[in-house]
């Protein structure tokens, strides 16, 4: 209710309201959490079907967005209903226009999650197409992403660092991301893929300034935060975003 009042009445927040108002719903079967919602482009949204976001919640949200006319294409990813994969952003987050950090077993491995492309026309579902994985589904929408492995090539480190929010990054801008410093194998993998690694203290003190065109991982301490289930993207609510130049 507090957030509802802020977004509705605060003078510094120019909001058109809510696509889905959870305080108005009395159904336990209609639930949505932000970690399952990834805005990939201004015309494409990805949603996780998880233990926290239900099928009815997804249907309600897609319909509400499509009725406003902005987005007609959705990718729905069915992820395991478990504590380790509580949200979609625990197994995949965007880190640049053309790359993402993934948890390999569930995105490219033998147990990769199914994905569905849901297309709306004239505010109605026109077609639903199933794909064997999320990256395959995204390619059909012109988004061919380069995956960077959480935990690197070692399966044990993949499991360990995914548990500690190693695939959960908050993008300050395309190529400028914030993540936990304790996920060292993931940071090493990002470095191999062209990311410069700096600390949050260096950025705050202006010892290091983020440069346009230079992919950069800003690391912060947060072992207790991830231990409690929080990731950098999980705990961030962007209030104002500039448009991305695709």
Protein language model regions, located:
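The feature marks the mature, well-folded catalytic cores of soluble enzymes
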Residues: 1-246
């Amino acid at each position: 209710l507090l957030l509802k009042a802020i977004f509705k009445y605060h003078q510094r927040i120019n909001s058109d309201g809510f696509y889905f108002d959870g305080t108005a719903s009395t159904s336990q079967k209609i639930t949505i959490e932000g970690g399952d919602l990834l805005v990939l482009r201004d015309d494409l949204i990805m949603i996780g079907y998880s233990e926290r976001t239900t099928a009815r919640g997804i249907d309600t949200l897609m319909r509400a967005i499509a009725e406003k006319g902005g987005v007609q294409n959705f990718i729905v990813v069915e992820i395991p209903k478990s504590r380790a994969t509580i949200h979609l952003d625990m197994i995949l987050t965007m880190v640049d226009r053309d790359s993402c950090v993934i948890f390999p077993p569930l995105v490219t491995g033998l147990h990769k999650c199914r994905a569905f492309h849901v297309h709306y026309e004239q505010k109605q579902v026109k077609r639903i197409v199933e794909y064997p994985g999320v990256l395959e589904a995204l390619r059909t929408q012109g988004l061919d992403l380069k995956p960077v492995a959480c935990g690197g090539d070692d399966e044990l480190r993949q499991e360990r660092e995914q548990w500690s929010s190693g695939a959960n990054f908050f993008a300050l801008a395309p190529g400028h991301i914030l993540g936990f410093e304790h996920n060292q194998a993931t940071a090493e993998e990002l470095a191999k893929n062209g990311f410069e690694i700096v600390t949050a203290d260096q950025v705050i003190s202006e010892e290091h300034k983020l440069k346009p065109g230079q992919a950069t991982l800003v690391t912060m301490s947060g072992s207790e935060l991830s231990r409690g289930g929080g990731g950098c993207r999980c705990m961030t609510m962007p209030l104002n975003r500039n448009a991305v130049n695709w």
